[in-house]
Amino acid sequence: MTLIVTGAAGFIGSNLVKALNERGEDGIIAVDNLTRADKFKNLVDCEIDDYLDKTEFVERFARGDFGKVRAIFHEGACSDTMETDGRYMMDNNFRYSRAVLDACLAQGVQFLYASSAATYGGSTRFVEEREVEAPLNVYGYSKFLFDQVIRRVLPTAKSQIAGFRYFNVYGPRESHKARMASVAFHNFNQFRAEGKVKLFGEYNGYAAGEQTRDFVSVEDLVKVNLHFFDHPEKSGIFNLGSGRAQPFNDIASTVVNALRALDGEPALSLAELVQRGLIEYIPFPDALRGKYQCFTQADLTKLRAAGYDAPFLTVQEGVDRYVRWLSGQV
């Protein structure tokens, strides 16, 4: 049976297509918008049955043109948290997602989709409950509003609906994301260009470089998506992070030490990296004061209760792998 991946040429979508191929699945319809043509590179080493533009796809899917579809991995969205065109964001992330959802419900197709930790906004609790959700930008609101639709239809849905609130994702195939690419990606490129990584200094009670995020490898995102694909009886909205809050210092030191290892140089402690000028702290920008999250950490209680019990990569494990992959692409 046919599988469909929207956002297939993007960061997470292309990693899903590749993982499905590795499981022997090649009857995949890839859906995307290649206005940014450079994204095609993410699909060069993948096997797909067909490619469709996102607009053509949703119309044809609603008509039932693709016969029996087993599942849709809906990863397509505008993920730029700096986007200020609210009409575009809502059309792309909310209205379009509703159209795909409606067609899945009508045809009994498994629907696995990307939500976001941006639904929590400035909250200090990250649990899948309405009272802690307070998005701070229109991107977060578009994801939040769609999650509310899901909550209303879940009690009567006769096919799987599984949404995943992605936290700070890093890993292969993200280079097209430019400013929205991961901290690890930018640290890698900055170190190669300047010989050092720059991090924010002290802010809001956090020491220099000690502001934390839940950083999660795209490898783990793919594994969770495939776990739920294999368990169509499991539905709901789930946090998808590592469950750990790790500081930006961990990302930077792992990137630098991984690159040093590739050059045959020994690993250095954080203090040594700072002393040698390989990590540098800069004043916290005034423009970000009052708008910056110093802490995120996914509560994985609900995900674990749904049966996903595999461990998640630490920053040290996942970023080291990623740096080695990036170095092989240069």
From Swiss-Prot:
One of its GO terms (molecular function) is NADP binding. It comes from Paraburkholderia phymatum (strain DSM 17167 / CIP 108236 / LMG 21445 / STM815) (Burkholderia phymatum). Catalyzes the interconversion between ADP-D-glycero-beta-D-manno-heptose and ADP-L-glycero-beta-D-manno-heptose via an epimerization at carbon 6 of the heptose. Keywords: Carbohydrate metabolism, Isomerase, NADP. The active site is at residues 139, 177. Pfam families: Epimerase. Its EC number is 5.1.3.20. Belongs to the NAD(P)-dependent epimerase/dehydratase family. HldD subfamily. CDD domains: ADP_GME_SDR_e (cd05248). Contains a large N-terminal NADP-binding domain, and a smaller C-terminal substrate-binding domain. It catalyses: ADP-D-glycero-beta-D-manno-heptose = ADP-L-glycero-beta-D-manno-heptose. Its cofactor is NADP(+). This is ADP-L-glycero-D-manno-heptose-6-epimerase. Pathway: Nucleotide-sugar biosynthesis; ADP-L-glycero-beta-D-manno-heptose biosynthesis; ADP-L-glycero-beta-D-manno-heptose from D-glycero-beta-D-manno-heptose 7-phosphate: step 4/4. Homopentamer. NADP(+) binds at residues 11-12, 32-33, 39, 54, 75-79, 92, 143, 169, 177. One of its GO terms (biological process) is carbohydrate metabolic process. Gene3D superfamilies: NAD(P)-binding Rossmann-like Domain, UDP-galactose 4-epimerase, domain 1. Substrate binds at residues 168, 179, 186, 200-203, 213, 292. Binds 1 NADP(+) per subunit. The keyword rRNA processing does not apply.
